[in-house]
């Protein structure tokens, strides 16, 4: 027998995951009352997990960093195989996790929340270092190494806009074509 929803105590991570989804889908609804409503709890639950709005804003940016960057990097570190194989794993993870949608939403939100700029800079640096390492492991050298790294980031950031309406099969075919493009010498 399940616990009634009203008696469940949500975790801080549940609040943050719901907030990130709202931010990506409908940023104008990123409000405490809307998050609480979607979680089926009162606003009081919010203040159990967050001291104030600033704590929430900072925590959401850090949650985004951890969920969409650090966890991906940690997964890559556990992968065996060639650098090309690891790049393919990275590309699949990014597509499956809606990473680009979350990234665009958080970056747009940062225009109104300047205190999250340091987290965004940290994420950018972590991602560039990781990609640079993968491409260097494939044997690419400067200046192509830097250009390939930055081009990958740009291409991936906007790719989801070009794949709207594609079947899963078509999306995977395009992913494979992009992978071949980025690993080609």
Residue ranges, per PLM feature:
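N-terminal intrinsically disordered/low-complexity leader segments
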Residues: 1-10
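Solvent-exposed, amphipathic alpha-helical segments
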Residues: 18-25, 71-75, 106, 155-159
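Short, basic, alpha-helical segments at the C-terminal edge of helix-turn-helix-like DNA-binding modules
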Residues: 32, 62-69
């Amino acid at each position: 027998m399940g616990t009634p929803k009203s008696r469940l105590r949500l975790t801080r991570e549940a609040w943050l995951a719901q907030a990130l989804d709202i931010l990506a889908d409908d940023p104008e609804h990123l409000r405490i009352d809307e998050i609480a409503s979607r979680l089926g709890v009162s606003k009081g639950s919010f203040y159990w997990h967050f001291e104030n709005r600033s704590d929430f804003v900072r925590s959401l940016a850090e949650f985004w960093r951890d969920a969409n960057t650090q966890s991906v990097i940690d997964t890559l570190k556990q992968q065996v195989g060639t650098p090309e194989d690891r790049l393919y794993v990275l590309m699949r993870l990014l597509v499956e996790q809606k990473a680009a949608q979350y990234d665009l939403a958080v970056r747009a939100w940062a225009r109104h929340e300047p205190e999250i700029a340091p987290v965004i800079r940290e994420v950018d640096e972590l991602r560039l270092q990781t990609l640079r390492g993968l491409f260097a492991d494939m044997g690419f050298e400067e200046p192509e190494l830097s250009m390939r790294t930055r081009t990958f980031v740009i291409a991936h950031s906007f790719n989801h806009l070009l794949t709207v309406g594609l079947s899963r099969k078509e999306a995977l075919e395009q992913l494979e074509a992009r992978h071949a493009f980025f690993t080609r010498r």
